């Protein structure tokens, strides 16, 4: 059974800090693009999908921002201009503000 042990560091899931280390090392870019009909989309790039569960992070952001969104490749797309609020929410999730552009 491998349910309680981290596959990266070999420690029990309760003691594993792999995700926190990964959060501190990410260089995240938050941009707003215009799409069809002038709709704005906030794009979050620079996240490593092997270290962080992008689906879980997207679900968290969509719930807090009350907007639609999706994961495309290694980036997250959210409907609307949410640059400032996304930066605030990512810092609350444990990402370093210095690494968010």
Curated annotation (Swiss-Prot):
Disulphide linkage map: none
Keyword DNA damage in annotation: no
UniProt entry tagged with the keyword Protein biosynthesis: yes
GO biological process, one term: translation reinitiation
Family matches, as Pfam families: SUI1
Superkingdom in the source lineage: Archaea
One MF term in the entry's GO annotations: mRNA binding
Keyword annotations of the record: Protein biosynthesis, Translation regulation
UniProt-listed InterPro entries: DENR/SUI1_TIF, SUI1, SUI1_arc, SUI1_arc_bac, SUI1_dom_sf
Family recorded in the similarity comment: Belongs to the SUI1 family.
NCBIfam families for this protein: PRK00939.1, SUI1_rel
Identification of the protein by name: Protein translation factor SUI1 homolog
Organism: Methanosphaerula palustris (strain ATCC BAA-1556 / DSM 19958 / E1-9c)
């Amino acid at each position: 059974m491998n349910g309680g042990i981290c596959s990266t560091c070999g420690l029990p899931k309760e003691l594993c800090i792999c995700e926190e280390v990964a959060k501190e090392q990410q260089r995240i870019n938050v941009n707003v693009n215009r799409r069809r009909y002038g709709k704005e989309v906030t794009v979050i790039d620079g996240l490593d999908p092997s270290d962080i569960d992008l689906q879980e992070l997207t679900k968290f952001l969509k719930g807090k921002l009350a907007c639609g969104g999706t994961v495309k490749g290694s980036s997250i797309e959210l409907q609307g201009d949410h640059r400032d609020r996304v930066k605030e929410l990512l810092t609350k999730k444990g990402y370093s503000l210095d690494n968010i552009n």
